[in-house]
Structures are given as structure tokens and as C-alpha cells.
């Protein structure tokens, strides 16, 4: 398969870096059905936390529920960070077809959207980071206190309830046109979400031998696990552009930060300034002291010969990821097919 150059136009140079982003001429809003569905996906897992606390207050949390929650959190979380993000979005490495499929399925069970839309939105975010065109910048409403607070809410959650479509044809043409396996998995997203809830229930029922055990596993390893992973991911979009350190140089107006407190829960994604300084690098934590479980897993895949062409070090000025003549170019190595 021939690699597809993924080059996106950047924002015109007129943006001053502090003003609110221009509003669309005719602001679009999500319809009733999308809003209702989004609300259910976002609110139901969060409400389950209240049910979980109520149950824990009376009878405690079983070791089975906690272990299942950790297992499903790790599997689906790494599916997002290693699969959706570093493999499919940035092509930080190539993987055997079966491993690509496993990671894509695991990421799809995180309730964060189908993989093609996820990839398209994230590539658009990198093309227009913290400037007009960025789908989830906390600086959307300017850099004043009120604007930042409103932007933080938008970047974390509010953007999910607006309708600013990101074209997969523009930002993920490689997956749409040349990757039938990923296209099938993307279309199976509703079924994989159902499996993400049913599997914890089935496991809890099988291990405990009771329907109650299945129900508590459904709450802790299903709904609460989903809520925690969602908010950790969204915190990278919001907090990791506003709070933390910026030790590495990124593109103009890019305010991505490193936030150590989220490193473990986000599997290394919160080393966001390091990531934005070199997006195609498989390691986001740029020093040995910066824990990056996603990079460790990619390294394991490489040692097992399940992954190759791993991009560990920042490239030179002629490297794969660069900004040239006002355009943002993503690494275009071709996924291995055998």
C-alpha cells in the first residue's frame, strides 16, 4: 500500500493568539437526537458513580469489581492511547494487522466515538492547535479569565454538544479509502460499546455466581470505568493546554503543557507539551523520569516483533513531521500488511 500524504492547511497568519476565535456565520447546533445520545453517554456513567458510592457505603466494594474495573480501564485506555492515538492518528509505529485490529477494538470500547471520527478530530486539533479551526481548544473564547473558564468547559465537555463536523474525508482519508479493517471496526462502534458494558456484567456474574455480582461489576467495571476514562481523556484536551509546564518548544500559539499528576491515569498522554513538540514520536514522556506506559507497551510490541518502524527520537529538520510553507504534515509511513 502506498502512503497517503496527510497535509492540512494551517490558520492564516492574522490570528493574534489571544482573541476569541471567529464564530461561524451560521452557528450549527446538534439536533435533539445527537444531543440526547451524547448526554446519555456522558451523564449515565457519571451518575453510576453515585450508585457505586451508595453501594460501597453499605456493603463495600468487592475485590472482583475493583480488579475487573482496573482490567477494563487498562485495556480500553491503552486501546485509545496506543491504538487510536499513537498508531492510527500519528503513525508512530506500524503494527501487524491483527494487532491493529485488537487495539482498534479495545479503543472503540472506551465510549469516545468511532475510531475514524476520533482520528479525524485529533488530526484537525494538531493542524490548528489553539487557534481558529481547533475543535477543542480552551482558548476558543479568548485568554481573559472569563474566556478561559468558558473555553475550559468547552474543551473538556461542551464541544460534544455542539455540531462542528470534522471531515473524515479531509483528515482521515487513509482509513476511509485504504483500510477496510479499520472501516469495519469503525462501523461496529455501537456493538462494541454494548460489549464494553455486557462483558463486565458477564464476568462479574460468572466469577461471583450471582446476578448481584454481575450488577456491581456492570456499575464499577462498566459505567464508572467509562466515566473515569472519559474524563481523564478530556482532561488532556482541556487541562493539558492550560495547567502545567511547557519545557519543549512547539508551534506558534500552541499552549500544550506537561501535567505530571495525570501521567499514570492517562498512560503517558498528559506529557502533552512533549507530544506537541514532536507528535509522531512514540514516546510522549521525553525523559526517563516521565512515566509513559503507552510507550512501554509499544516497546514491548517492538521486542516481540509485533511492531516495527517505531519512531522513538525526534527527527532532524528534514524529518517526517514538520511545518513547511504554512502547511502541517503528518508522518506517512505505511502500515505493514503482513
Predicted regions and their residues:
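Active-site-proximal inter-transmembrane loops
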Residues: 172-180, 245-271, 278
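Non-catalytic, topology-defining segments of multipass membrane proteins
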Residues: 1-234, 239, 281-338
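Short conserved micro-motifs at the rims of enzyme active sites and ligand-binding pockets
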Residues: 1, 275-276
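Helix-loop boundary elements of multi-pass alpha-helical membrane proteins
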Residues: 92, 242-247
